[in-house]
């Protein structure tokens, strides 16, 4: 969703990175008008410091995921030396989506508790979770190979009121997905939950 008019007078505001945020929790119905720019490209150029920040992981974080991702990256890069980092990042993202689909990962709202290395548990042990587990595990794998990535939260889906044409978006429509940053293309949305 892109800019709202007269944001200062409304309970919703737009952050510098284009998030729509509420000034306080919603307790009543909220109506606003917004438009969606499906092909909008954001942050086509991202400074080196910001790239490094968005491609880093805490030391010792999810060691199995890091080793698995780096092994795939090194093997594929060696087999395809002519392929640049952007194309390799796209291939790796597709590999992760294919893995989620082909290896019977499961969506559940009751995955139990995850420990300190949640991506390791998701990719190699439990193989189940809800959108936050799936998106964060995807982002951790992408960052493990140096690709700037982030988790995005918002809403997916809504119900249209046939009387007045408005769309009702409920808390049950809350969702998390991922974005990866690619040189010259900016942030690219990827919903790894959709692969399950």
Model-identified regions with their sequence ranges:
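Short, contiguous acidic/charged loop-to-helix segments that flank catalytic cores in large enzymes
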Residues: 121-130, 165-169
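Residue-level recognition of alpha-helix initiation/capping sites
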Residues: 91, 132-133
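Solvent-exposed loop/turn segments at secondary-structure junctions
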Residues: 39-42, 102-106, 114, 129-130, ...
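Hydrophobic/aromatic-rich core segments of domains that either
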Residues: 133-196
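Acidic low-complexity segments
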Residues: 2-125
């Amino acid at each position: 969703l892109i800019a709202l008019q007269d944001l200062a007078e409304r309970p919703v505001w737009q952050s510098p990175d284009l998030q729509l945020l509420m000034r306080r929790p919603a307790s009543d119905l909220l109506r606003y008008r917004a438009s969606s720019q499906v092909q909008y490209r954001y942050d086509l150029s991202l400074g080196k410091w910001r790239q490094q920040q968005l491609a880093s992981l805490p030391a010792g974080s999810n060691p199995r995921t890091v080793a698995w991702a780096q092994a795939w990256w090194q093997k594929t890069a060696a087999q395809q030396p002519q392929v640049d980092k952007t194309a390799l990042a796209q291939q790796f993202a597709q590999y992760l989506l294919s893995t989620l689909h082909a290896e019977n990962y499961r969506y559940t709202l009751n995955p139990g508790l995850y420990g300190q290395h949640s991506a390791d548990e998701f990719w190699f042990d439990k193989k189940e979770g809800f959108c936050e587990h799936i998106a964060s595990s995807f982002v951790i794998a992408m960052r493990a190979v140096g690709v700037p990535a982030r988790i995005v939260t918002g809403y997916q889906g809504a119900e249209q009121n046939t009387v007045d044409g408005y769309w009702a978006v409920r808390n049950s429509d809350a969702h998390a997905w991922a974005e990866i940053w690619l040189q010259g293309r900016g942030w690219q949305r990827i919903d790894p939950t959709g692969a399950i």
